[in-house]
Design a protein with these regions (language model features):
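Extracellular recognition modules
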Residues: 56-60, 132-136, 211-215, 298-302
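Solvent-exposed segments in extracellular or luminal domains encompassing
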Residues: 38-54, 120-138, 199-209, 281-284
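Short, exposed coil/turn segments at beta-strand boundaries within extracellular/luminal domains
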Residues: 62-68, 138-144, 152, 193-195, ...
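Extracellular interdomain linker/stem segments of modular secreted and single-pass surface proteins
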Residues: 74-81, 150-158, 165, 207, ...
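Short beta-strand segments within Ig-like beta-sandwich modules, predominantly Fibronectin type-III
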Residues: 113-119, 189-198, 274-279
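Short loop/turn motifs at secondary-structure boundaries
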Residues: 9, 158, 223-317
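Solvent-exposed loop segments of extracellular immunoglobulin-like
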Residues: 15-29, 104-113, 178-185, 190, ...
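A short beta-strand segment in extracellular, disulfide-stabilized domains
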Residues: 2-16, 94-106, 168-176, 246-252
């Protein structure tokens, strides 16, 4: 802003070496003030006219005016740098770089020195940390800018916790870590999305197969995804060959998810009617080719992970 604090005693030291002994100096903003010895300035003085201002020194000897002389106060402008800033770097994009800039006016004649030792107006970096750049004018005036580069990153999926097998409420919790800030989305096998949300927990998730997407919103570093399943059991099926609900099979198991699970079907008296695995199409409602009647049937599901579920369903004809 062209304003600076001057110690007028520094001028006195230089001038008194050229004057006879016993001379004292006082400073004034105007010649008239110096002439009338009014409004003397303090020795620690802030100039009131930006960049260039003339004040007056009155030299006295035994209370007699020895002379009045001009003193020129000059404030040389500092380099024009933008404010300190914080930038983000996506660690997953290494070794790509981001640009750090002193953000000075075009066509300037500054000299630059970065904390990295580089001497250009901008530099490319791919390491987080604190960087400084000092710009110096041809007059030797310097100013320093600090740029902090902080990390962001895509998420690492540590675990997907699924509380399933419940008729009323299956709960999915996504455990992820990383330097970013994340939103969570799950998409079912039909491509329908629950929508992105801040919470990593999803309630009332229907049985089936899903993909979880985790998006970094701190610096848009990217999206990671992973498949998972929610186990569930149909309450009924209608094996009438109309292409809908013709087979009874456990939801959320397949050749990819818990393929070594064992599924057993019993009649109401506990007789084993059939046994199959997730890789089969399921039970078609027949035993040895004979259609079973409309009734309730019981199942035991022994999942590959060791969990066991028992319940019943209805065969409708």
């Amino acid at each position: 802003d062209g304003i600076n604090t001057f110690n007028l005693d520094d001028f006195s030291t230089d001038m008194l070496t050229l004057l006879p002994p016993g001379i004292t100096l006082n400073y004034y903003e105007t010649y008239d003030d110096a002439l009338t010895e009014t409004n003397a300035l303090p020795l620690i003085y802030n100039n009131t006219t930006p960049y260039n201002q003339t004040i007056y020194a009155r030299a006295e000897n035994n209370n007699a005016c020895y002379g009045i002389n001009q003193v020129f106060l000059t404030v040389k402008p500092l380099p024009q740098l933008s404010n300190d800033e914080t930038l983000l770097y996506c660690l997953n994009q290494f070794p790509e770089t981001i640009q750090l800039s002193a953000s000075t006016p075009l066509n300037n004649t500054y000299y630059y020195l970065w904390s990295t030792g580089q001497t250009t107006a901008s530099i490319a970096v791919n390491t987080v940390g604190t960087y400084t750049v000092t710009a110096t004018t041809v007059d030797g005036c310097s100013k320093t800018k600090t740029i902090i580069v902080e990390p962001s990153n895509i998420a690492t999926i540590d675990n997907i916790e699924v509380i399933d097998g419940n008729i009323n409420n299956n709960i999915v919790t996504i455990l992820a870590s990383g330097e970013g800030e994340y939103l969570y989305e799950i998409i079912n096998e039909e491509g329908l999305s629950f929508g992105y949300q801040e919470s990593n927990t999803f309630n009332n998730v229907k049985p089936g197969f899903y993909s979880v997407n985790i998006k970094d919103v701190k610096n848009n570093c990217g999206v990671v995804n992973q498949l998972f399943s929610v186990v569930g059991f149909p309450l009924f099926f209608t094996p009438n060959n109309d292409g809908s609900n013709d087979y009874w099979q456990v939801y959320g198991v397949s050749s990819q998810f818990q393929p070594k699970s064992v599924i057993q079907i019993f009649d109401r008296y506990g007789k084993l009617l059939t046994q199959f695995t997730p890789t089969s199409i399921g039970w078609d409602g027949t035993v040895n080719g004979i259609p079973m009647p409309t009734n309730d049937y019981w199942f035991t599901v022994k999942l590959q992970d060791g969990r066991i579920y028992k319940n019943h369903f209805t065969l409708k004809r």
